[in-house]
């Protein structure tokens, strides 16, 4: 009886690897079923962007309709199975992590004083910024007389839809 093994790809050592793992501010709450594959560690892996991802983020139409953001999240955060369902509170952390994974933790900024033209160079440590994002909790219902209001953060689909409507109204 012979045992057949899968052929090993000689380039497998060069495949993209996760560069960082992050804990989502929502803790994985507020995702519908089958929208997130949260590992037992509670942290999702984040891969660096590919050239295709960078080009996607430079395409105005894909940014306007939200599909570009979804494609980049699909590529860089494969544990997020449906990026349209991401609670808004997780988006900032995800994109900071993608930036760290792709370009490193330092974000160089250059500013110029409008009054004296003095130039200021500064580097922001994105790891510190990522660590300062608070964990959000929406579990406390609000009771008003006989009514009870339960809150949840909007998901990316809702936020993107509202932004498109706002853009259309401002265009008029």
Per-region residue spans from a language model:
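Long C-terminal interaction/binding lobes of large macromolecular proteins
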Residues: 1-172
């Amino acid at each position: 009886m012979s045992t057949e093994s899968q052929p090993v790809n000689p380039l497998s050592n060069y495949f993209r690897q996760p560069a960082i793992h992050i804990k989502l501010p929502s803790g994985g709450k507020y995702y519908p079923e089958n929208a997130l594959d949260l590992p037992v560690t509670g942290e999702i892996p984040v891969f660096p962007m590919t050239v295709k991802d960078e080009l996607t983020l430079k395409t105005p139409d894909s940014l306007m309709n939200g599909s570009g953001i979804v494609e980049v999240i699909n590529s860089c955060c494969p544990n997020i199975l449906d990026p349209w369902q991401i609670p808004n509170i997780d988006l900032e952390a995800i994109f900071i992590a993608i930036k760290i994974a792709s370009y490193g933790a330092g974000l160089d900024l250059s500013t110029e004083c409008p009054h004296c033209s003095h130039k200021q160079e500064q580097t922001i440590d994105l790891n510190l910024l990522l660590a300062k994002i608070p964990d959000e909790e929406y579990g406390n219902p609000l009771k008003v007389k006989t009514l009870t209001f339960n809150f949840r953060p909007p998901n990316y689909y809702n936020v993107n839809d509202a932004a498109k409507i706002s853009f259309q109204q401002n265009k008029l």
